Swiss-Prot record:
GO terms for molecular function: (S)-2-hydroxy-acid oxidase activity; FMN binding. It comes from Zea mays (Maize). FMN binds at residues 78-80, 107, 128-130, 156, 231, 253, 286-290, 309-310. It holds the Pfam family FMN_dh. Disruption phenotype: The mutant shows deficiency in glycolate oxidase activity and is non-viable in air; leaves become necrotic within 7 days and plants die within 15 days. When the mutant cells are shifted from high CO2 to air in light, they accumulate glycolate linearly for 6 hours to levels 7-fold higher than wild type and 11-fold higher after 25 hours. It is found in: Peroxisome. This is Glycolate oxidase 1. Catalyzes the oxidation of glycolate to glyoxylate, with a reduction of O2 to H2O2. Is an essential enzyme in photorespiration in plants. Photorespiration plays a vital role in C4 photosynthesis in Z.mays and is essential for maize seedling development and maintaining low (non-toxic) levels of glycolate. PANTHER family: 2-HYDROXYACID OXIDASE 1, S -2-HYDROXY-ACID OXIDASE-RELATED. The keyword Flavoprotein applies. Glyoxylate binds at Y25, Y130, R165, H255, R258. Homotetramer. The active site is at H255.
């Protein structure tokens, strides 16, 4: 194996290393996987308008997220059950994110608990939350995240039911017997039963609350002072509702194309959300980020930062903590290079004028009518 030169190469290594059920769980999307492909392809249709002859000898990639200073606008998205990828699981990811000076989001469905992740040492961490039918479970989880020093809640709002992930159905996906969903240990919610289709789909149907609505976003604010990021917004309408309901931020997300197929790529939905937010709250994006150029494009469209998920899991599977560190370093280095070659020395200098989107190309064509 030669030197790894980009983030995508880790996926091929992960595929060789992991059991099929684990790899398919991480890699697959919903139904036809159109959105899964589109999350990547939409980035490739956005082009650069680089500015030249600008002194780029010093480049500052630092930024602030919810008041926390981080080294770069690239953060770790929540991904479930990381010990299926590597025995160190979320511990390794937490250490790599902290070493890179960025934020890690821990999944509700992690195979390490909030307390265990906190024990890895200092670091800025967010907690991704699913709202369970039993609100006492939710309250307990939020309390534990607060006590463990987590700084924000990323509330997933696009999963009243689990998307139809056909690979998981074929594989009859279930959490391996030696692992548990550590945040639910002792609650009878830590294990996943074998099912006729996907064990996770059955688990979600049994535990996650389908009645979840904006009133629950309000309720969460009554039980915690932590800022709440609404994760899973794709439209202007829901952006305005997020603002009206006191969200601290929005994550434009289609759940890694694992929920509703044929929704737009997140990078395609981003500008609509940013415009509707009117600067009243920060807008982040996840889904399909594999290059530093992708990070730049997202920021040019108004994102305050990006979250990466699958690249973290695949690099974790391939090389543990060192793999995750390497992915974060490669993305950082590529992003820095993109800034330099585009003529930007700070994030504030990245503007909409630095890119051309499909809609820009269309509006530039004079109408024949």
């Amino acid at each position: 194996m030669g030197e790894i030169t980009n983030v995508m190469e880790y996926q091929a290594i992960a595929k060789q290393k992991l059991p099929k059920m684990a790899y398919d769980y991480y890699a697959s999307g919903a139904e036809d996987e159109w959105t899964l492909q589109e999350n990547r392809e939409a980035f490739s249709r956005i082009l650069f308008r680089p500015r030249i002859l600008i002194d780029v000898s010093k480049i500052d990639m630092t930024t602030t997220v919810l008041g926390f200073k981080i080294s770069m606008p690239i953060m770790v998205a929540p991904t479930a059950m990381q010990k299926m990828a590597h025995p160190d699981g979320e511990y390794a990811t937490a250490r790599a994110a902290a070493a890179a000076g960025t934020i890690m989001t821990l999944s509700s469905w992690a195979t390490s608990s909030v307390e265990e992740v906190a024990s890895t040492g200092p670091g800025i961490r967010f907690f991704q939350l699913y709202v369970y039918k039993d609100r006492k479970v939710v309250e307990q989880l939020v309390r534990r995240a607060e006590r463990a020093g987590f700084k924000a809640i990323a509330l997933t709002v696009d999963t009243p039911r689990l998307g139809r992930r056909e690979a998981d159905i074929k594989n009859r996906f279930v959490l391996p017997p030696h692992l548990t969903l550590k945040n639910f240990e002792g609650l009878d919610l830590g294990k996943m039963d074998q099912a006729a289709d996907s064990g996770l789909a059955s688990y979600v149907a049994g535990q996650v609350d389908r009645t979840l609505s904006w009133k629950d976003v309000k309720w969460l604010q009554t039980i915690t002072t932590l800022p709440i990021l609404v994760k899973g917004v794709l439209t202007a309408e829901d952006t305005r509702l997020a603002v009206a309901n006191g969200a601290a931020g929005i994550i434009v997300s289609n759940h890694g194309a694992r929920q509703l197929d044929y929704v737009p790529a997140t990078i395609s939905a981003l500008e609509e959300v940013v415009k509707a937010a009117r600067g009243q709250l920060p807008v982040f994006v996840d889904g399909g980020v594999r290059r530093g150029t992708d990070v730049f494009k997202a920021l040019a469209l108004g994102a305050a930062g990006v979250f990466v998920g699958r690249p973290v899991v695949f690099s974790l599977a391939a090389a543990g903590e060192a793999g995750v560190s390497n992915v974060l370093r490669m993305l950082r280095d590529e992003f820095e290079l993109t800034m330099a070659l585009s003529g930007c020395t700070s994030l504030a200098e990245i503007t909409r004028k630095h890119i051309i989107t499909e809609s820009d190309k269309l509006s530039a064509i004079p109408s024949r009518l």
